[in-house]
């Protein structure tokens, strides 16, 4: 896998990452200076008269303070960069997920997408800011230590890195694949946790009604435990990599130094200070080697996140987003010509469907379950694309119209009202936030919602809970209808929009809406007599086609 996403985001924040990397390099310079100064100080204390102890001590303290200051700056700037990268990643991921077609959301678990935009993007932002940006300083510390070892004693200075570095690569080779597999398992387990929580919280009434709280609690607990165990295993390995690599490198260096006491090896020492410096740089070399090992482990974990993000970002947005055609207010003439459609892995629902709805016509679709009523609605709203055939609006192929401009021609009320967790007003003005108070009241009255809204202590400011949980089914439908009526589009689509109304409320709605719907194209999916009475034409869909049950001028 090519880390294209990693490179793209690194390039986007190259200024911040380069600055962090530059300060990290300055910190590594201070780090490299300290062993030499410490060795000079130790030699001076041991009696080397050629060393100025005061000057050496001052330089050592300066290097320590500089390293501390640089490390603090790196930590603060890394946290700031991580926050900005995380915000950008989440925003871009959310925007792209929103642009994906409904068919994508139907074939992917909500928990996977929630895990992606919340937890997985955090891994990538942390890797970019806290790990990758500090790589230059770590590499410089390791490289500088190797160069200085060679300058002090070319013999041992060459042998130490030749034995220490292979320890790093062997360890990484052995653990890299294991970390990648663990990373994938952790992501799947976290997605399960999100999915179970989302599903169970939306099913609380059913879970309580069937008294299955214990089963769902245990299922969720099992998902949490699986995720915990996998993350613990992953943490153990990543925690193991750096220190153990450092230990093995240190033991290797010690073995080389011991062997260096043999005749002919290490005989070039010129002073005690150089001996101390060689020992200090040998010890220093093990730290960046361990850090590089830890960075490699983090990269293996992050690779899985990058692969998952690339899969989502590579999924194409809805085709209509690329269309350039604009749409003024439509007259509402709709035609489906030779339309075929089948859901993935299922038999065809529509085969060669030809259906025309005139502008201003009210058409009711009836028929048994599964004959394609809702499928027609999904195709009209471009939630799905037909496998064959053509759909036009006022004679224009809808695939040539910008999908957002096209959908603004519709007022859609689904069978299951889709409501925000905010106030009644926020739900009614959804997409029409600048609506005037009198417009909101009129739409609510037409939907037979104003009486119950005005009876509430906070009226339109009443908070209705997630998905309108604090309202009855009929009240939720009334708010959804008010939302569509406020939009005042040329075309309405009502999918069992009054199925939760009482008979009196439905009759009042039909009576009030006769004038409002005049001149509008309306497509109804309903079996209720009061709503059917609105229709100019009633069409019965069957597995083999359709026929008019009622046709009046």
Question: What spans do the regions from the language model cover?
Answer:
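Transmembrane helices of ABC transporter permease
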Residues: 12, 16-26, 59, 133-185, ...
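An intracellular "coupling" helix at the cytosolic face of ABC transporter transmembrane type-1 domains
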Residues: 12-15, 102-106, 119-128, 132, ...
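Transmembrane helix-loop-helix hairpins at lipid-water interfaces of multipass membrane proteins
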Residues: 17-70, 150-155, 268-272
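Hydrophobic alpha-helical segments in the permease module
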Residues: 59-71, 161-166, 238-252, 269-294
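Short intracellular "coupling" helices and adjacent cytoplasmic loop segments at the cytosolic face
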Residues: 83, 91-115, 119-121, 195-219, ...
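ABC-type nucleotide-binding domain
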Residues: 328-553
């Amino acid at each position: 896998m090519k880390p294209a996403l990693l490179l793209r985001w690194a390039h986007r924040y190259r200024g911040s990452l380069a600055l962090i990397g530059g300060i990290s390099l300055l910190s590594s310079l201070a780090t490299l200076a300290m062993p030499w100064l410490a060795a000079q100080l130790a030699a001076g204390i041991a009696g080397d008269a050629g060393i100025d102890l005061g000057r050496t001590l001052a330089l050592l303290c300066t290097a320590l303070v500089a390293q501390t200051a640089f490390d603090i700056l790196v930590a603060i700037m890394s946290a700031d960069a991580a926050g900005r990268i995380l915000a950008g990643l989440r925003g871009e991921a959310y925007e792209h997920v929103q642009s994906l077609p409904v068919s994508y959301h139907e074939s992917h678990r909500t928990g996977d997408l929630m895990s992606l935009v919340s937890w997985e993007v955090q891994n990538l932002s942390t890797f970019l800011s806290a790990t990758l940006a500090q790589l230059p300083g770590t590499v410089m510390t390791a490289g500088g230590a190797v160069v200085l070892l060679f300058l002090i004693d070319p013999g041992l200075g060459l042998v130490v890195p030749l034995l220490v570095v292979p320890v790093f690569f062997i360890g990484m080779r052995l653990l890299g694949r294991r970390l990648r597999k663990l990373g994938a398992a952790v992501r799947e387990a976290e997605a399960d946790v999100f999915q179970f929580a989302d599903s169970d919280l939306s099913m609380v009434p059913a879970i309580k009604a069937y008294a299955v709280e214990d089963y769902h609690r245990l299922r969720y607990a099992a998902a949490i435990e699986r995720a915990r165990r996998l993350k613990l295993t992953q943490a153990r390995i990543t925690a193991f990599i750096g220190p153990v690599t450092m230990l093995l490198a240190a033991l290797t260096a010690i073995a080389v130094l011991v062997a260096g006491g043999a005749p002919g090896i290490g005989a070039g020492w010129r002073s005690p200070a150089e001996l101390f410096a060689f020992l200090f740089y040998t010890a220093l070399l093990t730290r960046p080697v361990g850090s590089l090992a830890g960075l490699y482990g983090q990269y293996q974990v992050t690779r899985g996140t990058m692969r998952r993000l690339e899969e989502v970002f590579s999924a194409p947005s809805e085709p209509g987003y690329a269309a350039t055609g604009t749409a003024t207010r439509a007259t509402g003439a709709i035609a489906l010509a030779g339309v075929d459609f089948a859901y993935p892995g299922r038999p065809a629902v529509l085969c060669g469907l030809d259906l025309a709805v005139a502008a201003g016509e009210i058409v009711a679709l009836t028929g048994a379950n599964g004959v394609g009523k809702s499928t027609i609605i999904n195709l009209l709203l471009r939630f799905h694309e037909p496998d064959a055939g053509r759909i036009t609006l006022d004679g224009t192929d809808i695939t040539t119209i910008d999908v957002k401009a096209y959908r603004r021609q519709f007022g859609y009320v689904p069978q299951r009202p889709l409501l925000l967790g905010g106030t009644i007003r926020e739900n009614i003005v959804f997409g029409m936030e600048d609506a005037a108070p009198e417009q909101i009241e009129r739409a609510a009255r037409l939907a037979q919602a104003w009486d119950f809204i005005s009876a509430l202590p906070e009226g339109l400011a009443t908070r209705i809970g997630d998905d309108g949980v604090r309202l009855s089914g009929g009240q939720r439908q009334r708010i959804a209808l008010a939302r569509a009526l406020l939009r005042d589009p040329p075309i309405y689509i009502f999918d069992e929009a009054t199925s939760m109304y009482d008979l009196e409320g439905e009759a009042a709605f039909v009576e009030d809406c006769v004038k409002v719907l005049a001149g509008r194209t309306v497509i109804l999916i309903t079996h209720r007599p009061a709503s059917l009475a609105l229709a100019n034409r009633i069409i019965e869909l069957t597995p083999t086609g359709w026929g008019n049950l009622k046709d009046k001028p």
